[in-house]
């Protein structure tokens, strides 16, 4: 199980990303719009740089919802391989059955 502080840090980052997503998108639109004057685009890039670093989506790291494990993460289920196997063995994931041939 991951440290609680790491899990909480990741949750804080997720909240920041959601909070600043619209503002970031608007500033990026201005920065990449070639029809606007260079000065206006530069001001937008400075405003983007003033936003918190943790508000960038690239700072997020996928973690297991149950354990907080950052490695071997299955995006569809939001679980690590260990919890996927454990819950699958107990039949707690709908449609998942143990393989036998």
UniProtKB/Swiss-Prot annotation:
The keyword Cell cycle does not apply. It comes from the Bacteria. GO terms for biological process: translation. Gene3D superfamilies: 1.10.287.1480. Keywords: Ribonucleoprotein, Ribosomal protein, RNA-binding, rRNA-binding. It holds the Pfam family Ribosomal_S14. The keyword RNA-binding applies. One of its GO terms (cellular component) is cytoplasm. One of its GO terms (molecular function) is structural constituent of ribosome. Binds 16S rRNA, required for the assembly of 30S particles and may also be responsible for determining the conformation of the 16S rRNA at the A site. HAMAP family: Ribosomal_uS14_1 (MF_00537). Part of the 30S ribosomal subunit. Contacts proteins S3 and S10. Belongs to the universal ribosomal protein uS14 family. NCBIfam families: PRK08881.1 (NF006477). This is Small ribosomal subunit protein uS14.
């Amino acid at each position: 199980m991951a440290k609680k502080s790491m899990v909480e840090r990741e949750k804080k980052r997720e909240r920041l990303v959601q909070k600043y997503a619209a503002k970031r998108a608007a500033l990026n639109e201005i920065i990449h719009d070639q029809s606007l004057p260079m000065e206006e685009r530069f001001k937008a890039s400075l405003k983007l740089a003033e936003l918190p670093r943790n508000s960038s989506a690239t700072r997020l790291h996928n973690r297991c919802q149950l354990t907080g494990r950052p490695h071997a993460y299955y995006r569809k289920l939001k679980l690590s391989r260990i919890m996927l196997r454990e819950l699958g063995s107990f039949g707690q994931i709908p449609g998942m059955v143990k393989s036998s041939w």
